[in-house]
From Swiss-Prot:
Species for this entry: Drosophila willistoni (Fruit fly)
A Pfam family per the record: HEAT_Ints3_C
Subcellular location(s) per record: Nucleus; Cytoplasm
PANTHER family registered for this protein in UniProt: INTEGRATOR COMPLEX SUBUNIT 3 (PTHR13587:SF7)
Record protein name field: Integrator complex subunit 3 homolog
InterPro entries named among the record's database cross-references: HEAT_Ints3_C (IPR056518), INTS3 (IPR045334), INTS3_N (IPR019333)
Amino acid sequence: MEQQPHQSKSASYISKLFVCTSVDCKDEIEEKFERSFVNLQQQISGLGDKEMHDILSQIACKDKQHDEMSIGLLYIMLTDPIMAPKTYRDITLVSRDGMSVIVANLTLLVAEKYSKLTEGACRQIIWVLREFVKHQVLSVENVIWNCLRQAGGGDVSHKNLYLVENLLDIFIEYRNWLETNPFLVQSIVYSYVRLIEDHSNPALASLRQKEVNFTISLIRDRFQDVIPLGRDFVRLLQNVARIPEFEQLWRDVLYNPKSLHPTFNGIWQLLQIRTSRRFLQCRLLPEMERKLHFLASSVKFGNQKRYQDWFQDKYFSTPESHSLRSDLIRFIINVIHPTNDMLCSDIIPRWAIIGWLISSCTNPIASANAKLSLFYDWLFFDPTKDNIMNIEPGILVMYHSIRNHPFVSSTLLDFLCRITKNFYVKYEDKIRMGVYNSLKLILDKQVIPNLQPLFESPKLDRELRNLIRDNFREFVSPAATNSLSQPLYPTICSIQAPIFKKETDQRIMQCSQDHFEIGEATFNANSDTIVSLLDGENKIVVIPTETLTTDNEVVFSDEDVEGVGRPNKNEENTDDDDDLPLSKVRLKEKPFTEKIELPQTIAESFETFVAKRNSFTWESFLKDFRTLPACTLEEGQLNYVISNAVLVLRDTLPQNHIFSESKTDEKFLAKSISYPLYGLFRFLYENEDKSKKPFQTMLSEICERIPEIGYLLLYFMKIHCKLQTRKNSQHPYQFKTSVYRQICEATDDKIVNCLVRDLDLLEKENTAIYLWLLPDIYREFKSIAINNNEILRITLRCVDAKNVRDIIYSVAQGKLAIFKHDCIIECIRESLDYETYEQFCLWQLIQAHDVPLKSIQDLLPELEAANHPEALSHMLLLLKNEEPTNEIIRLMLSREAKARGDSFVTSALRFWCQRYEEKLSEIIASLLTSKYPSSSPNKRKRPTKSSSASSSIPSADQVLNHLEHYRRSCRHGTGTGLYVHDMMQRALQSAYSHSNDSTKKQFSDLFALAAEDETSAVGRRGGSGRGRKQPLNKKDSNIHNTGNKKNSEILKTVYSSDDNSSEEDWSKHKISQAAKKRKKNIPDSE
């Protein structure tokens, strides 16, 4: 009855900050805000300004109360618009951390709880944000970024539009502040270009025009910040290309890129840059991202329908929301990369989620954009730097759908064939190479066994199969082709004409009014499904992808729409000079029709090099060219020299067997570095002085167009030093890492990034050479390579048992050091996600380096039995060779105790009990005793910060849990001597006396061990604990015997799982041991 008023009071309380229903439970964030507000009100309610300021100043002096006060004041600002200005003034006066607590909690609130905030709180967030920006509060950009994430795409609700417009007003008002933060500029540009697409409704015309004016202005003024947005920014720009301001931007991007920024070379530069995951992430609501992660990581394949239905109802219920599908597909492809364990499990795969998103889309425009999002990375794929996980979903959707859902596979295949040819005709050859690279790597990595079941399926119509044969003839079996034409990607042949120039094509873009216009939501009535593309004349055009019939059956390659919107291919682009093998993909340039005159200082040597194409003439030219000042060469002459030099260097490299067949024969070694490219290395090796600008420019171009240059230089230095040392053994040659640094500077990248990239390419090219160079790499690049996780992973993924043996030999001989003891723990942490075999190899190498346990023992609490079996098994073997110490035991007992116990801890305690039982018992007992206050007031001391931090882990419950599970593991009395030692008995007594009833009940069997000893040793020692036990009278003796019988029954239930166990013998043995130990402690006077 007394609780009823309290219940009614809590029920009547209505939160001013959150919208709550009767079934909602408050979580930690909501409770924290409301609790802080209530506590603050209790202290300042009814006070005047001066008294309140004094109280707030006093509160601010204490860390915990300062944080609570800051949250309470933030609550007031978000819920009381009238008091907000005064509260903000109070915060600025008393805050002693630059408002970092307020900013951090506001960021958390926006990221986690924005959807539950009241309408008034949402308005106040904008007010607070404006004040923060106005006064340039630190880290306010974090709040802004999370607010941008809440401005969802495909949502034209009043709440969302209010947020979008008010954020825009802040950005316009404080433009100067905004431009000082490049990342924020990028996020805003990316977000608003995406949002503009959704605001095509005439009712939103004023908002849309404001967005367009601001976004275009920001893009043009800060284009150097926009360039890193990469290819997905181009994809978004296509969707708004018909808006006049964006159309003019497209003209400048295509025809006058230097007007936007001096370093901008055109649209292909953007298309080659992979868009950062953070920008793809910022276009998804945080709540939506969490739901998507749950779907892709926790839902079993076959059980996903109800989750998908919920997702459909929640996020795809309006016509505008269809545009969201492209954002989701790009996010899934580029951000959600499942581990190997997840790929092998029965969790719903990414391709199934993407297939659902595409097949459930009823809007033809959104459907076409969703397909473009699926294949977008294919068009520009470079296997040397792009991730296969970005192209895997596309092929798997088609491959797994061909049997039961052939219309999905047919639609996607038709789209892929057409987009390859029509996305951007000027660069069709490069895009076709990207798609070829994708399919080639898919087969090389066995993502699917082969393409024949897909490309030659009888479920595809005849026109589509012909289209596939025309576009992917290399991947279609000869039996499926009537007459095989010349391969589309032949191997490179010798180039007879050594004079080249860049193709220039300055055509005028003409915009046809009957073309598709996503920005205005209008399109050609003759085409049902269309996608915005760039044709050969750089016009924004359309391409038909499919025609939907009334019964939802799909018709592909319809003759009526075959030619609609398909631009004529430029007749000049008919040769195949651009087709190179997969590992040598570098596009060539068109030849000059006339020769360019060069300065006399280099003309003769250059012509000789071009004619003879050998290393000697190349080095002669380099001697003349190295000191040539920049003023001597015009830009056209420099381009002429660089283009021809690069092509000759690339053409003279062997296509196969680029490395020596023998690692000892001098003839083979010398021949393998006799090509002109190695002449450049030799020249740099002998001339380390700073070169003139033309030489540096040429070196940069060579590095850009020949990606193998890095690992070929490492190979050259190994061979060159080996050969020179053999010629003159008294003066051994050494690696000159300074030469490699020159190459890194030419690529404008850090040496660590270059080294990792080059070693990765080398391992993929030739594992044997990679392992041969490995000791030299770790010796010469010691500061970079040692403890480098990326290089270590490259090594582990390629070694077999013999390779591991050879590496261990090198380590044992002192020729190779892969680890330093100091930071090796980070390497092991990183390796916990590696494949099992890779982890076993890693631990072999760790053992070879004699890494002491103290260097890695901090990992003990982090390792989980279910997820890290490899690391735990090796750690246990290391522990077997160690004596138990206070620190090791503390870390081990800090491990989380599962319901069934921790077999790792139990195993370690068992084998230590065999050799160090008494020491182990004392260490655990002292650790357990330290968790409780001392019984003697004279021994109470104020703990220091360091001691309190270390003593807080493990907790008393953790220690008791591990002791309990260890007790359960003991069978027939083996290993239980741990509990009979004096210190352990006292520790258990102390634990029992300081435990609450639930703990006593939970560990009753464990405490019973101390209880038994209490009757025979501890509890009957008199006042001082030193006197001899008094003899018992007959009555007491009977009681005592009864107690022993009860204890015996307890012991039997604790230790026996077997009817025939000899618990009586164990009890007698244990008691006799305790008696012997007690006898030693009796003073002589007794």
